[in-house]
């Protein structure tokens, strides 16, 4: 079907010699060609909008997740560091036994061996397992990898690289008092 009216295609116009010469592809009348004017610019409207929507989505996600995570993960308790602390009554550790207490940020095992109290770190120096007093073997033992220590934390055998950290211990007013050595 043929076009009716005053429509003339650019190709026909140039062959008939009427009107201005057709603009080359990509050129903007009265300015630079499109390729030249946007050289080095690498974004389009769609890409720009995608980045804006993505950024808004990220802000919404973070602002929603932050309070949820704060609610689920409890705040760390701040431990007041002291030089000396009464950890419990002297009757807690009868002769031939040992008991673990919290002292500052460490766990301490207090051992009563023949009426003599000693206190050492209850954390094995090998991999950080909790040690215990082995009454039958008369020593401090680590259940994880078989580390063995004397009552005062010295190495007997096992894979541990260092002896247990020592603390001072005394009985004062019927209470066991542990202090930094």
UniProtKB/Swiss-Prot annotation:
Key word Transcription regulation present: no
Cofactor info, note text: Binds 1 [2Fe-2S] cluster per subunit.
SUPFAM superfamilies listed in its UniProt record: ISP domain
Cofactor(s) needed: [2Fe-2S] cluster
Cellular location(s): Cell inner membrane
Disulfide pairings: 129-144
Region (Disordered): 1-35
Enzyme Commission number(s) from the entry: 7.1.1.6
UniProt family annotation: Belongs to the Rieske iron-sulfur protein family.
The keyword Thylakoid is annotated on this UniProt entry: no
Topology in the lipid bilayer: Multi-pass membrane protein
Alphabetized PROSITE patterns for the sequence: RIESKE (PS51296)
Residues given in the record as [2Fe-2S] cluster binding sites: 124, 126, 142, 145
Reaction(s) catalysed by this chain's protein: 2 oxidized [plastocyanin] + a plastoquinol + 2 H(+)(in) = 2 reduced [plastocyanin] + a plastoquinone + 4 H(+)(out)
Miscellaneous remark of the record: The Rieske protein is a high potential 2Fe-2S protein.
Organism superkingdom: Bacteria
GO cellular component, one term: plasma membrane
PANTHER family xref list: CYTOCHROME B-C1 COMPLEX SUBUNIT RIESKE, MITOCHONDRIAL
Protein name (database record): Cytochrome b6-f complex iron-sulfur subunit
CDD domains reported in the protein's UniProt record: Rieske
Main location (coarse class): membrane
GO MF annotations, alphabetized: 2 iron, 2 sulfur cluster binding; metal ion binding; plastoquinol--plastocyanin reductase activity
